[in-house]
Amino acid sequence: MPKPHSEAGTAFIQTQQLHAAMADTFLEHMCRLDIDSAPITARNTGIICTIGPASRSVEMLKEMIKSGMNVARLNFSHGTHEYHAETIKNVREATESFASDPILYRPVAVALDTKGPEIRTGLIKGSGTAEVELKKGATLKITLDNAYMEKCDENILWLDYKNICKVVEVGSKIYVDDGLISLQVKEKGADFLVTEVENGGSLGSKKGVNLPGAAVDLPAVSEKDIQDLKFGVEQDVDMVFASFIRKAADVHEVRKVLGEKGKNIKIISKIENHEGVRRFDEILEASDGIMVARGDLGIEIPAEKVFLAQKMMIGRCNRAGKPVICATQMLESMIKKPRPTRAEGSDVANAVLDGADCIMLSGETAKGDYPLEAVRMQHLIAREAEAAIYHLQLFEELRRLAPITSDPTEAAAVGAVEASFKCCSGAIIVLTKSGRSAHQVARYRPRAPIIAVTRNPQTARQAHLYRGIFPVLCKDAVLNAWAEDVDLRVNLAMDVGKARGFFKKGDVVIVLTGWRPGSGFTNTMRVVPVP
């Protein structure tokens, strides 16, 4: 028998924590994790960055893309349409600056985060950056009088929810700025409340307000949201992060506003309160994905229960094969410091181990002093965490839970992932039009990156929502002979994989293709050595 080619099967991508990956039990897997095992070169988890004053210049955006940003999030709680239009233009300009080289080009998605039915305070002394100190025990009057909309200070605070006096009682608590400041209601009038500061701190302009336990009667989609969503459709955004989704009907309402023209926009529902957690299954059913928005969630439900909600939501999303994003305070201290706390490093890693498809940065990239360092840090932590996943058990369970199906794409996807484990493949190459074939493969959480080749730019951008998909945009004209066109795209994926260090000549890759043109015909799996 001829000796096997000495390089074959040593795909270095698979040596990462391989000893641990082959363990028989989860405990043994943990015992075998090795801090000196080099991680994989590809990162499978998507990184979403909020774009703000610290990061909206084209130059900075280029650096962020190089550092690993996959999705640019625009927070519509702040800023005008002109402001956001300029940011979108800058993101696209930064992305396209890499377009001359199809090997290195990375499509970046644009996400619109709605303001939603949230309550915010007014401006402090007319300035977006001013702050005032609220002292514990002090009296603070809350007013609905618009004369104070831009004149808030340490004595009087305007907020934008007109029915607040109807839904809070004397003794109710009001939380401001992600719960950092707490107020207790002492008396209520027709259009004002008198509160005592329980927990003080410095208060900035336009901060979020939470009323835990109050039956807040705000519409799921406000007038502002409708205008913002229509603006998003015009601007051709790729996804919407819908704030404060409480039930499936809220998601349908967002979809209705997006209309026919925005029917391909993915709707990611943000779960931010008790009702959203309680009705999670119906919301998941109606949505394209879920965001675990831990900021507001951690005020609306007790802080010590947030991790339970996070694990439950990520688990159910993984089971259903829908993307899930873990967000809020992931590297919060990096707003002001170049290194994260140990707890934050652990938090990012554990979100990845829980099964999150994407991890998100908010203030860290929007207004922080170290936006690039934050992106790089998430990239490095995610890579290490991905290597430490106990894939043996995960794949077994995902396969057991998946319903029996006669759909050729689903069956081929399971086969491709199983084969990728067996032969330690350097990557799984998928040719996909709508993206569905790649999503099916991602659902089974392979160790190897999924290189998804598509000619549809939106499919490429939206693919970042799914764990493990590395989208490649093919800009070549379609060849007449179907087989030649397949080879053209597979070869592009091979070139990208080699250039990115995912695999080298002689390694094995899995190739998943269709047997004829069009969507819905993916059914052929091949095991191919890299040329």
UniProtKB/Swiss-Prot annotation:
<feature type="modified residue" description="Phosphotyrosine">
    <location>
        <position position="175"/>
    </location>
</feature>
<feature type="modified residue" description="N6-acetyllysine; alternate">
    <location>
        <position position="270"/>
    </location>
</feature>
<feature type="cross-link" description="Glycyl lysine isopeptide (Lys-Gly) (interchain with G-Cter in SUMO2); alternate">
    <location>
        <position position="270"/>
    </location>
</feature>
<keyword id="KW-0547">Nucleotide-binding</keyword>
<dbReference type="GO" id="GO:0062023">
    <property type="term" value="C:collagen-containing extracellular matrix"/>
</dbReference>
<feature type="binding site">
    <location>
        <position position="120"/>
    </location>
    <ligand>
        <name>ATP</name>
    </ligand>
</feature>
<feature type="modified residue" description="Phosphoserine">
    <location>
        <position position="100"/>
    </location>
</feature>
<feature type="modified residue" description="N6-succinyllysine">
    <location>
        <position position="498"/>
    </location>
</feature>
<feature type="binding site">
    <location>
        <begin position="516"/>
        <end position="521"/>
    </location>
    <ligand>
        <name>beta-D-fructose 1,6-bisphosphate</name>
    </ligand>
</feature>
<feature type="modified residue" description="N6-acetyllysine; alternate">
    <location>
        <position position="166"/>
    </location>
</feature>
<keyword id="KW-0379">Hydroxylation</keyword>
<feature type="modified residue" description="N6-acetyllysine">
    <location>
        <position position="433"/>
    </location>
</feature>
<dbReference type="GO" id="GO:0045944">
    <property type="term" value="P:positive regulation of transcription by RNA polymerase II"/>
</dbReference>
<dbReference type="GO" id="GO:0000287">
    <property type="term" value="F:magnesium ion binding"/>
</dbReference>
<keyword id="KW-0832">Ubl conjugation</keyword>
<dbReference type="GO" id="GO:0006096">
    <property type="term" value="P:glycolytic process"/>
</dbReference>
<feature type="binding site">
    <location>
        <position position="295"/>
    </location>
    <ligand>
        <name>substrate</name>
    </ligand>
</feature>
<keyword id="KW-0670">Pyruvate</keyword>
<keyword id="KW-0021">Allosteric enzyme</keyword>
<dbReference type="GO" id="GO:1903672">
    <property type="term" value="P:positive regulation of sprouting angiogenesis"/>
</dbReference>
<keyword id="KW-0460">Magnesium</keyword>
<feature type="cross-link" description="Glycyl lysine isopeptide (Lys-Gly) (interchain with G-Cter in SUMO2)">
    <location>
        <position position="115"/>
    </location>
</feature>
<feature type="modified residue" description="Phosphothreonine">
    <location>
        <position position="41"/>
    </location>
</feature>
<feature type="modified residue" description="Phosphoserine">
    <location>
        <position position="97"/>
    </location>
</feature>
<feature type="modified residue" description="N6-acetyllysine">
    <location>
        <position position="475"/>
    </location>
</feature>
<feature type="binding site">
    <location>
        <position position="296"/>
    </location>
    <ligand>
        <name>substrate</name>
    </ligand>
</feature>
<comment type="pathway">
    <text>Carbohydrate degradation; glycolysis; pyruvate from D-glyceraldehyde 3-phosphate: step 5/5.</text>
</comment>
<keyword id="KW-0702">S-nitrosylation</keyword>
<feature type="modified residue" description="Phosphotyrosine">
    <location>
        <position position="105"/>
    </location>
</feature>
<keyword id="KW-0324">Glycolysis</keyword>
<feature type="binding site">
    <location>
        <position position="296"/>
    </location>
    <ligand>
        <name>Mg(2+)</name>
    </ligand>
</feature>
<protein>
    <recommendedName>
        <fullName>Pyruvate kinase PKM</fullName>
        <ecNumber>2.7.1.40</ecNumber>
        <ecNumber>2.7.11.1</ecNumber>
        <ecNumber>2.7.10.2</ecNumber>
    </recommendedName>
</protein>
<keyword id="KW-0488">Methylation</keyword>
<feature type="region of interest" description="Intersubunit contact">
    <location>
        <begin position="389"/>
        <end position="433"/>
    </location>
</feature>
<feature type="modified residue" description="N6-acetyllysine; alternate">
    <location>
        <position position="266"/>
    </location>
</feature>
<feature type="binding site">
    <location>
        <position position="73"/>
    </location>
    <ligand>
        <name>substrate</name>
    </ligand>
</feature>
<dbReference type="InterPro" id="IPR040442">
    <property type="entry name" value="Pyrv_kinase-like_dom_sf"/>
</dbReference>
<feature type="modified residue" description="N6-acetyllysine">
    <location>
        <position position="89"/>
    </location>
</feature>
<keyword id="KW-0539">Nucleus</keyword>
<dbReference type="GO" id="GO:0061621">
    <property type="term" value="P:canonical glycolysis"/>
</dbReference>
<keyword id="KW-0007">Acetylation</keyword>
<dbReference type="InterPro" id="IPR015795">
    <property type="entry name" value="Pyrv_Knase_C"/>
</dbReference>
